[in-house]
């Protein structure tokens, strides 16, 4: 029997023995203990439970494959008959099939869904690793992502709000690649000040303004779909939505710096963009080779834009993926000390950092939140039970929030992550409640918005606990 369960039982016994009804939070905790072995009751409990927010969320990875098939049909695109990826027309009917066939051909539809996600993944000679299949899925649906932001936002915001989330930070590229195209004609120089000046003069302001307009259009389309302001308003109208500017770290260094600069500029100009983040697989060649340079870039830009928040994918590496020296390279520590990360996503290789106890102590002291993506860690990285880092961070008092990462590709949601915490790591009700509170406490919003979100979360918990 776990220590939290013993303490809970003693607390309830003392309370009842004194003739006093247990407090609402105690009743909710007791209910979780009662239903943890009853899947149908546990899921209902966790679905209704307030979860705060999702701080690690990739927009394109959060949309389900069925939606991407719909976009491909709407756009007149094709399906590659061998890879089942969405490709450009014309469709020849043999090597490439009209996407409309995925609406009527059940077998084809299921092949496409499996290609655009990790559903039904089984290793094969041409597709032998779930992690590689996971990243390949993004290429398979990439063609239809930029033209459907309103629908995509509507899908993920509704899903979050329907699970009793009140806040979402999602990662995207607001300028839709305009900055990457701009940087293609700019030569690299180690003089970051000169490079910044060149990029600003090359049209960065236009790209940033275009990014804000893209968000305007997408949000207006989302609100229209939600019928916000009417009696038929969708539950998603009440969710607070913010964005992280994602930087593709596997690109050439001039492109990476240009994206970083655009992210800092946009966060300064548009309050909806609250942070920048580096994305793409961390074992990509440029991501590994240029990691120290990327941190220096962030350090340089942080000094110019000190009020812009930074959260970084860090330590998303596991033994066997890379040489041991890369695991020992203290990517997590460097992301915090040099890259100025206030939050860390994943943090899987913490035990391999040199002097890991000191790094963990530093994270606890500085209140560096770890965005723990339980589902992707377990299913994509095969890190379960003792191999998972969640207990390590909890044991060392590092703040944690649970996040979905790419719920569309992994076919999951935030409720699933909370359920995994309960079933796989014996998380009790106070721990789950702390996860939810941390997601608001460490959210990158202004003080007034944070106070409002915290008050709303308190009220949501009061209503939830009063139901038991």
Spans of features found by a protein language model:
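Bacterial N-terminal signal peptides
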Residues: 7-17
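Metal-cofactor-binding active-site regions of metalloenzymes
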Residues: 23-468
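Positively charged n-region of N-terminal signal peptides that target proteins for export
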Residues: 1-5
